[in-house]
Curated annotation (Swiss-Prot):
Residues 1-21, 675-692 have a biased composition (Low complexity). GO terms for biological process: positive regulation of cilium assembly. This is Protein TAPT1 homolog. The lineage of its organism: Eukaryota, Metazoa, Ecdysozoa, Nematoda, Chromadorea. It comes from the Eukaryota. Residues 656-667 have a biased composition (Polar residues). It comes from Caenorhabditis elegans. The keyword Membrane applies.
Length: 712
């Protein structure tokens, strides 16, 4: 009787008490798991050294049991048991027992190679702080131990492979700088020679042609002929003014000065020459623009033009006098007895090296310095020519005197070359500039050569060289005329014949130099176009395809570095250059072989579709340089809106089907299922296929729903 009420009393127990007992059971299980893990760690850490006779063997083939996996398995077992208790009769369920395979007295033994090794222990944080790195190395040593260690210690450079590889690459780049620099300077020197010889050969011929053409009324007077006329007037007027200067008096005045005064005077002349060069081209541009922009045959026009012409003549006279002083000072240095003056003047180049190497340089500043070096190199050649003519005239053209001057000339030129090599090598090293940057500079001045041959050129080629490199040939030409007029006199037929032969020789050199220079310019620009096409096709095709927004960004392109002149440099345009491309050539090279076949197939397909659809113009996403002086301004025909599609399908299904197939075949970043409108005759007349031999800029378009518009 007593058992029945007790049973019913247990069955009618409050559910809250049962839930609390389950929570207590879960807490106890988790505590037991935690205690078992802690005991296991403690037993591993604090275990005594095992006996070598009875080592414990570890079965590596068995499944590794971690504390985390053990706890998860126990929780799953506990939940299953609790669920069965709630569903079944609580009395029939046996007591829950913790399934554990870990025994509290079990110890893990680690067998070491050495029988006398200490057990594995984890160092405390205090021990880690107290123990200094390389504690076993920084130990006091005796005399013999230190001696033996110095003899037998070893090291390996492969432990820092990346750093030493980078050092070797920098050394190779440092040694490549003179070669890359000389390629640029040589091509720039050809341009200076072309601009200088132009004043003695083609400018007089153009002047005579314009005068006779205007007198005989064969052709109209143009602005180019006005510029040629003004240049001839400036050269003739300044030459007549320079003839009043006594060069012998200048020579003796300079020679009577001391060594230090000559050194300071020569440095002052160099600084003044650079300042005059930066100002001279602006004066000439102002004169030429005033003579061609104002209303002609008016009083104000003649007053302004004459004022600018007088200023230009005065500038040319002063600059020519400055150059003559430089040549006279250099001649005094050559004729000095101990040549101390010449050595001191040559040391001025190393002072320039000190002032430029340790400055921060960007690519634009390096281009400015390289162009200035081209001008200085041609300038020193002109001065040496004048010194040689003066000395040979003084000794009645004795060959022995010329052989005595050759070592001094070689020393001056060699010092100039050596200082330029060191200067550019250390500037590129300290500023982390790639050696391929000189290819960018060469392409930039080659672009000037091609642009000057265009029919729509805005200036003469000699003026473009002056703006680019700061080289003004007019003062040098006036100095050459002054020296040659003192050296040779045209008082007999023999002198006239020699003068004619010399002029024909200069004329032949000018033509040959122009042909070589133009051929090199075409080669450089063509190479730039090929590299640009490969870069755009291989590196940026995937990114342009993935851009599926309505306004696609401008296609990245390899831009030419464009500078207005040598002393006023704008910021370089964004884009990839040849040096950036060649630095990533290893990434691009493996895919070139596979892409050549694909590109040839794509070109053949494009040509076939272009001839088949001569009345249609498809939008171009990226076209590699096709025409340098102008951008491609042609726009594709507008696409119809969505509400006109049913009508077009019913009216002309044949044209719609053809246009849909052609649009699906073109490489487009966004594929839309829209049908193109029939192309009218006006759209077909505006369609012009771009030749593969031309150069054009890259154009990106955005694709709205109503049509195609170009992003400016």
């Amino acid at each position: 009787m007593n058992n029945v009420p007790s049973t019913s009393r247990e069955n009618s127990r409050n559910p809250s008490e049962s839930s609390s007992s389950i929570q207590d059971l879960l807490i106890n299980v988790e505590a037991n798991d935690l205690s078992s893990v802690v005991n296991e760690d403690v037993s591993i850490t604090m275990s005594a050294p095992p006996s070598p006779a009875t080592p414990r063997k570890i079965d590596f083939s068995a499944e590794i049991e971690t504390p985390k996996s053990t706890g998860i398995r126990r929780r799953l077992t506990l939940k299953d048991s609790i669920g069965s208790d709630l569903e079944n009769d609580p009395e029939s369920t046996p007591a829950i027992r913790k399934p554990s395979r870990i025994s509290y007295d079990e110890r893990l033994t680690v067998i070491c190679d050495s029988q006398t090794s200490s057990p594995l222990q984890t160092p405390s944080p205090s021990q880690e702080r107290d123990s200094a790195p390389f504690a076993d190395v920084f130990q006091p040593k005796g005399f013999f131990s230190f001696f033996w260690e110095e003899l037998t210690r070893g090291y390996s450079l492969h432990n820092d492979h990346a750093r030493f590889s980078e050092k070797r690459r920098k050394v190779y780049a440092f040694l490549r700088i003179p070669l890359e620099l000389e390629q640029f300077l040589t091509y720039g020197l050809l341009q200076c020679i072309d601009a200088f010889f132009y004043l003695f050969t083609f400018l007089p011929l153009r002047f005579l042609m314009s005068i006779f053409g205007a007198l005989l009324r064969i052709k109209r007077w143009t602005s180019a002929e006005t510029c040629d006329f003004l240049k001839v007037v400036i050269i003739v007027a300044a030459s007549m003014l320079i003839r009043e200067i006594d060069s012998s008096f200048l020579y003796h005045q300079v020679r009577s000065q001391g060594v230090i005064k000559l050194y300071i005077f020569y440095n002052m002349l160099e600084v003044a020459d650079r300042l005059f060069s930066s100002l001279g081209q602006d004066i000439f541009d102002a004169l030429l623009w005033t003579a061609n922009s104002e209303k002609r045959f008016s009083v104000g026009y003649f007053i302004r033009t004459c004022g600018h012409l007088i200023v230009a003549i005065l500038y040319a006279t002063l600059h020519s006098f400055l150059v003559i002083l430089q040549a006279t000072t250099l001649n005094v240095a050559f004729n000095s007895h101990n040549q101390t003056v010449l050595a001191i003047m040559m040391s001025n180049n190393f002072v320039e090296l000190k002032g430029s190497v340790f400055k921060k340089f960007a690519k634009a500043n390096l281009f400015q310095m390289a162009c200035s070096d081209v001008r200085e190199r041609f300038h020193i050649f002109a001065l040496l020519f004048v010194v040689m003519i003066r000395n040979m005239t003084a000794v009645n053209w004795n060959i022995d005197s010329f052989t005595e001057m050759i070592p001094d000339i070689i020393m001056v030129v060699g010092c100039e070359y050596f200082v330029d090599w060191l200067k550019h090598a250390f500037i590129t090293k300290f500023n982390e500039i790639n050696a391929e940057v000189y290819k960018d500079f060469t392409i930039t001045i080659a672009f000037d050569v091609i642009r000057s041959r265009d029919q729509s050129a805005f200036s003469d080629y000699s003026d473009q060289v002056s703006r680019r490199m700061g080289f003004i040939p007019i003062p040098l030409s006036i100095m050459i005329i002054r020296v040659l007029s003192q050296t040779f006199t045209l008082d007999n037929w023999g002198s006239c014949i020699i003068f004619g032969i010399g002029w024909l020789l200069v004329f032949a050199v000018k033509i040959c130099n122009g042909v070589v220079m133009l051929g090199q310019a075409c080669h450089h620009v063509k190479r730039f176009r090929d590299i640009q096409a490969r870069a755009e096709f291989e590196l940026f095709r995937k990114r342009m395809v993935e851009k599926k927004s309505k306004s696609a960004p401008n296609s990245p392109r390899m831009s030419l570095i464009d500078f207005t002149d040598v002393l006023h440099q704008p910021a370089a345009g964004k884009g990839f250059t040849v040096s950036d491309m060649l630095s990533q050539w290893e990434e691009l090279q493996p895919s070139l072989l596979s892409s050549e076949i694909r590109r040839s197939t794509d070109r053949e397909t494009a040509v076939s579709h272009l001839t088949a659809r001569s009345d249609e113009r498809t939008p171009r996403r990226a076209v590699s340089m096709a025409h340098i002086p102008r951008r491609d301004r042609s726009e594709p025909p507008p696409a119809p809106s969505m509400d006109q599609d049913p009508q077009l399908d019913t009216e002309d299904p044949v044209v719609t089907e053809n246009n849909t197939n052609s649009n699906s075949e073109q490489a487009s970043p966004v594929k839309k299922k829209t049908t193109a409108a029939p192309v009218t005759s006006s759209a077909s007349t505006n369609t012009n296929a771009t030749s593969s031999d031309e150069l054009a800029d890259v154009t990106a378009y955005k694709m709205p729903e109503q049509g195609v518009q170009r992003i400016e």
